[in-house]
From Swiss-Prot:
Belongs to the glutaminase PdxT/SNO family. In the presence of PdxS, forms a dodecamer of heterodimers. Only shows activity in the heterodimer. L-glutamine binds at G47, E48, S49, R106, I134, R135. This is Pyridoxal 5'-phosphate synthase subunit PdxT. Pathway: Cofactor biosynthesis; pyridoxal 5'-phosphate biosynthesis. It catalyses: aldehydo-D-ribose 5-phosphate + D-glyceraldehyde 3-phosphate + L-glutamine = pyridoxal 5'-phosphate + L-glutamate + phosphate + 3 H2O + H(+); L-glutamine + H2O = L-glutamate + NH4(+). It holds the Pfam family SNO. Its EC number is 4.3.3.6, 3.5.1.2. Catalyzes the hydrolysis of glutamine to glutamate and ammonia as part of the biosynthesis of pyridoxal 5'-phosphate. The resulting ammonia molecule is channeled to the active site of PdxS. It comes from Bacillus velezensis (strain DSM 23117 / BGSC 10A6 / LMG 26770 / FZB42) (Bacillus amyloliquefaciens subsp. plantarum). The active site is at C79 (nucleophile), H170 (charge relay system), E172 (charge relay system).
């Protein structure tokens, strides 16, 4: 069985686990770097990106996460997780993991009062998907090697590059698990390709 981890430092961890399990995979909360060895893919959940980065430093996650990515294992960043994955953050020189070749802007849809839901057309999904946006970032620029999966009002809100997937919204906060399933399929494909 495929095992997908959710970085359990803060954010909507339980909801992601529920969504992973609804897709028929095993969901594990990752609280220690050594747990990364036992999973096939990792979700970086929403939360607050600067707090998350501080916790990642405190618990010595940065280097193990880069090694995890270097092994080609899939990673999916949602909301603040997208900011953690991004190569560049607008208005600052301090990227976090710097893996997904995009420039993101934080809180670009406004503060918490501006949380909203929107029907999104996402590449790879037949029917619209309801995206829940909460203090969401968006992708200002995507590199040539990045596939844009979804735009909302002219702003990029989901993108994929190799084994990295990122989105501005919270796919785990609905009962529609198709976006999580896209990621599970990425992890499944990688596992099959690397099986000895």
């Amino acid at each position: 069985m495929l095992t997908i981890g959710v970085l359990g430092l803060q954010g909507a961890v339980r909801e992601h686990i529920r969504s992973i399990e609804a897709c028929g995979s095993k969901g594990v909360v990752i609280k220690r770097p050594e747990q990364l060895d036992d999973i096939d893919g990792l979700i970086l959940p929403g939360g607050e990106s600067t707090t998350m980065r501080r916790l990642m430093d405190t618990y010595h996650f940065m280097e193990p996460l880069r090694e995890f990515a270097a092994q080609g294992k899939p990673m999916f960043g949602t909301c603040a997780g997208l900011i953690i994955l991004a190569k560049e953050i607008a208005g600052t020189d301090n990227a976090h993991l710097g893996l997904l070749n995009v420039v993101v802007e934080r809180n670009s849809f406004g503060r918490q009062v501006d949380s909203f839901e929107a029907d999104l057309t996402i590449k790879g999904l037949d029917e619209p998907f309801t995206g829940v946006f909460i203090r969401a970032p968006h992708i200002l620029e995507a590199g040539e090697d990045v596939e844009v999966l979804c735009e909302h009002n002219g702003r990029i809100v989901a993108a994929k590059q190799g084994n990295f997937l990122g989105c501005s919204f919270h796919p785990e906060l609905t009962d529609d698990h198709r976006v999580t399933e896209l990621f599970v399929k990425m992890a499944e494909k990688h596992k099959q390709e690397t099986a000895v």
